[in-house]
């Protein structure tokens, strides 16, 4: 059994504070895979040769699938855990910068469904990827420029409706002020040492500058940006690298969940099904043997859960509410907004009981619509039995969300048991 030290919150915080975007997160995971397993990268546009060992595949820099294979156990089922790498936010329009009233302000495009008001009056960083030309070749660099700007509120004296449900106009009211001296694009290129004529494109998103913090009188909670769903990504990664390689375990990190997953690097693509099939092709399994194997496999989809808010208890079903500090949550929906079935729930609950892991169940109130996640999409795409779980949080899609450290540890323990023992 792995030492309890690997469950310490500082490792969780390291991922949160060093992964402001999916690009950074995938790089972070890649480094861990190489450090722990000397994992070998495979590419989708090349032939695969697989022997016993650890491998990973990246898709467009923001999605990744890692797998461990023992060729002697090539007929055994896949044990899959999946999460998403993206979070709601404000993407920079790199060439939509204006200078008004002596300051440069930068227009954005809203990604996903953030709680807009939480972005106001916060120290903002800018992170992502920049592509440029060098010696006629296309190169790229990841950036994370801290404290680059702010979206200031209008003073209450000039906006008396600010505390009465004021609605922010995304184009006019969410402009990020960055400087009085130079445009943000010029600042970025200067820091990277790139001439303007060599700039090609970028994918940049504003994030909070403040690092994650352990909070509360007893140090029970962790507040951070991007907990949805970097908490799920960390739980999978921690479990994957700290369990034995006796099983055919697979860690999946999809992008673009927050905008529907319908991209080549999202759950609503052939990425996972293609990787699973190509693994078995490389292992000389027949098509029928591959289908038999996938029908024996199991997928745990982990994403954030709405924790019951003490100030808004009427929003939750009192019999099916998710309490912070009371363990992993199984997500259920009559309309299959989540992939959980009674069969899958029974299997997971049995695994949890055998390993003394606390679990709870959430079903939304009948008059409150349920969200959804990658579970049902991945389930339909692969046909693999899937269950949706997660850890409860407050203020989902806020710039700063809050989770229970104890719940996160329980999620890691559950995934470790799954990777070690199956289901």
From Swiss-Prot:
GO biological process terms, semicolon-separated: proteolysis
GO cellular component: cytosol
EC code(s) of this entry: 3.4.11.-
InterPro entries: M18_aminopeptidase_2 (IPR022984), Peptidase_M18 (IPR001948), Peptidase_M18_dom2 (IPR023358)
GO molecular function, one term: metallopeptidase activity
Chain coiled-coil ranges: none
Names of the cofactor(s): Zn(2+)
Source domain of life: Bacteria
Residues annotated for Zn(2+) binding in this entry: 84, 157, 397
Keyword annotations: Aminopeptidase, Hydrolase, Metal-binding, Metalloprotease, Protease, Zinc
The keyword Hydrolase appears for this protein: yes
Family, similarity comment: Belongs to the peptidase M18 family.
HAMAP family to which the protein is assigned, alphabetical: Aminopeptidase_M18_2 (MF_00467)
Entries under NCBIfam families matching the protein: PRK02813.1
Entry protein name: Probable M18 family aminopeptidase 2
Gene, per the UniProt record: apeB
């Amino acid at each position: 059994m792995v030492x309890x030290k690997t469950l310490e919150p500082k490792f969780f915080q390291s991922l949160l504070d060093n992964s402001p975007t999916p690009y950074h997160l995938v790089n972070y995971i890649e480094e861990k895979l190489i450090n722990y397993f000397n994992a070998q990268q495979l590419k989708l546009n090349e032939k695969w040769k697989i022997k016993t060992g650890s491998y990973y595949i990246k898709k467009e820099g923001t999605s990744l699938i890692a797998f461990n294979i023992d060729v002697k156990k090539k007929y055994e089922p896949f044990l899959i855990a999946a999460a998403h790498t993206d979070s709601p936010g404000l993407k920079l329009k790199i060439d939509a910068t204006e200078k008004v009233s002596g300051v440069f302000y930068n227009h954005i495009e809203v990604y996903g469904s953030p709680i807009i008001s939480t972005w106001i009056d916060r120290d903002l960083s800018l992170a992502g990827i920049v592509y440029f030309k060098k010696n006629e070749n296309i190169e790229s660099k990841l950036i994370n420029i801290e404290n680059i700007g702010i979206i200031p509120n209008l003073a209450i004296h000039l906006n008396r409706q600010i505390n009465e449900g004021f609605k922010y106009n995304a184009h006019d009211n969410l402009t990020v002020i960055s400087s009085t001296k130079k445009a943000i694009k010029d600042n970025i290129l200067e820091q990277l040492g790139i001439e303007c004529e060599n700039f090609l494109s970028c994918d940049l998103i504003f994030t909070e500058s403040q690092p994650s913090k352990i909070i509360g009188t007893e140090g029970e909670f962790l507040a951070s940006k991007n907990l949805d769903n970097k908490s799920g990504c960390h739980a999978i990664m921690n479990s994957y690298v700290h369990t034995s390689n006796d099983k055919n375990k697979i860690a999946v990190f999809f992008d673009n969940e927050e905008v529907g997953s319908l991209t080549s690097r999202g759950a609503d693509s052939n990425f996972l099904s293609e990787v699973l099939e190509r693994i078995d092709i490389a292992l000389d399994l027949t098509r029928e043997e591959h289908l038999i194997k996938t029908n024996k496999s199991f997928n745990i989809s982990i994403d954030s859960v709405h924790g019951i808010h003490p100030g808004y208890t009427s929003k939750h079903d009192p019999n099916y509410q998710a309490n912070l500090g009371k363990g992993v949550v199984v997500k259920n929906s009559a309309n299959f907004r989540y992939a959980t079935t009674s069969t899958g729930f029974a299997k997971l609950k049995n695994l949890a009981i055998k390993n003394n892991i606390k679990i709870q169940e959430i079903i939304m109130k009948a008059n409150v619509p349920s969200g959804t996640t990658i579970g049902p999409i991945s389930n339909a795409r692969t046909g693999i039995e899937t269950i949706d779980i997660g850890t409860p949080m407050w203020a989902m899609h806020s710039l700063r969300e809050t989770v229970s450290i104890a719940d996160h540890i329980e999620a890691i323990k559950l995934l470790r048991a799954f990777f070690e023992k199956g289901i």
